[in-house]
From Swiss-Prot:
Any one GO molecular-function label of the UniProt entry: histidinol-phosphatase activity
Gene designation per UniProt: hisB
Gene Ontology BP terms: L-histidine biosynthetic process
Keyword 4Fe-4S annotated: no
SUPFAM superfamilies: HAD-like (SSF56784), Ribosomal protein S5 domain 2-like (SSF54211)
InterPro entries: HAD-like_sf (IPR036412), HAD-SF_hydro_IIIA (IPR006549), HAD_sf (IPR023214), His_synth_bifunc_HisB (IPR020566), HisB_N (IPR005954), Histidinol-phos (IPR006543), IGPD_sf (IPR038494), ImidazoleglycerolP_deHydtase (IPR000807)
Known cofactor(s): Mg(2+); Zn(2+)
Subcellular location: Cytoplasm
EC number: 3.1.3.15, 4.2.1.19
Keywords from the named record: Amino-acid biosynthesis, Cytoplasm, Histidine biosynthesis, Hydrolase, Lyase, Magnesium, Metal-binding, Multifunctional enzyme, Zinc
Protein name: Histidine biosynthesis bifunctional protein HisB
Alphabetized NCBIfam families for the sequence: HAD-SF-IIIA (TIGR01662), hisB_Nterm (TIGR01261), Histidinol-ppas (TIGR01656), PRK00951.2-1 (NF002111), PRK00951.2-4 (NF002114), PRK05446.1 (NF003937)
Active-site annotation: D11 (nucleophile), D13 (proton donor)
């Protein structure tokens, strides 16, 4: 095992398998029962890059009160079931002592996991102890990692999987210059509740088109030097929005990455997008008017160029039609619809053969 791995140190009885409520020993095959959804959850956690280590106290294992052969039959069956379904444990760490023995390996003491800690194998920010007892949480504290208390009703395997693999894709960017004061918030996994105020009514409407057709939430508050013109307001808003989208995407693991969309309204709007990590814009649209509403038409291409710079994406965007209002709107709608495809989470893999985006 390489250094600094994401490791889940998982309790056995009451967490992976049901703990008998009377004698607390799984010492016969007919007492073996898996906890709900444990196998599909562990498989998904493995796919997300977690290594699995079982850590369990087995009171008096190997004594008359708990003969080794009584333990082995159901335990080996459990391991065979896990392995047959693709669940692989790097280690199975067992303390066989009674609490009164005052050994160094019984949870929550560190004896069982000492090698992992001393060898630098644990990614302390992204490793967890999962178990149903307070001693499991104490073990986590002693290891200086986080603990999750398993409960089939309130914190079952489905919820644990969600908590460990679904990270909130949100970001807030504050950008302040001599010309503008901007705050942009995006939540890529929520829709509705958009609140956009730039001082430019038509521009507000266009930004709302991106969020609405992109399927995400945007809150954008801008104060700019509109007494001069709209240049700084549009440019800096694009820079802040692109940065917010990039930060919300994180490492881009699991996203679609690519998107393509056409047409929009009566205009033929075409958009192709790659969240490649490399800024590039190819833009093709002609306007017959200098302004639509309070937005300068020359700022449309400048908006998308600034956005691609901070989002770090490759964008091909074009539209043709007879009405400038509809042409501009089709560009923003097409971009939003294409972005929706590209940011959608489809799995857990990074969509790049290079291993980084």
């Amino acid at each position: 095992m390489s250094k600094q791995q994401k490791i889940l140190f998982i309790d056995r009885d009451g967490t992976l398998i049901v703990e008998p409520p009377v004698d607390f020993q799984v010492d016969r095959l007919d007492k073996l029962k898996l906890e709900p959804f444990v196998i599909p959850s562990l498989l998904s956690l493995q796919d997300a890059g977690y290594r699995l280590v079982m850590v369990t106290n087995q009171d008096g294992l190997g004594t008359d009160s708990y003969p080794q052969e009584d333990f082995d039959a159901p335990h080996n069956m459990m391991m065979e079931i896990f392995e047959s379904q693709g669940v692989k444990f790097d280690d199975v760490l067992i303390c066989p002592h009674f609490e009164k023995d005052n050994c160094s390996c019984r949870k929550p003491k560190l004896g069982l996991v000492k090698e992992y800690l001393q060898a630098g194998k644990v990614d302390f920010q992204n490793s967890f102890v999962i178990g149903d007892r307070q001693t499991d949480l104490q073990l986590a504290e002693n290891m200086a990692i986080r603990g999750i208390q398993y409960n089939p009703e309130t914190m079952g395997w489905k919820q644990i999987l969600k908590d460990l693999t679904v990270k909130a894709r949100v970001a807030e960017v504050v950008r302040t210059t001599k010309e503008t004061d901007i705050k942009v918030f995006v939540n890529l996994d929520e829709q509705g509740g958009n609140a956009i105020s730039t001082g430019l009514g038509f521009f507000d409407h266009m930004l709302d088109q991106i969020a609405t057709h992109g399927g995400f939430q945007m809150v954008c508050k801008v104060e700019g030097d509109l007494h001069i013109d709209d240049h700084h307001t549009v440019e800096d808003t694009a820079l802040a929005l692109g940065q917010a989208l990039k930060e919300a995407l994180g490492d881009k693991r699991g996203i679609g990455r690519f998107g393509f969309s056409l047409p929009m309204d009566e205009c033929l709007a075409q958009c192709a997008l790659d969240l490649s990590g490399r800024p590039y814009l190819k833009f093709d649209a002609q306007f017959s008017r200098e302004q639509v509403g309070d937005l300068s038409t020359e700022m449309v291409v400048h908006f998308f160029r600034s956005l691609t710079d901070t989002l770090a994406c490759t964008l091909h965007l074009s539209s043709a039609g007879n009405n400038d209002h509809h042409i501009i709107e089709s560009l923003f709608k097409a971009f939003g619809r294409t972005l929706r495809q590209a940011i959608k989470v489809e799995g857990t893999e990074l969509p790049s053969s290079k291993g980084v985006l």
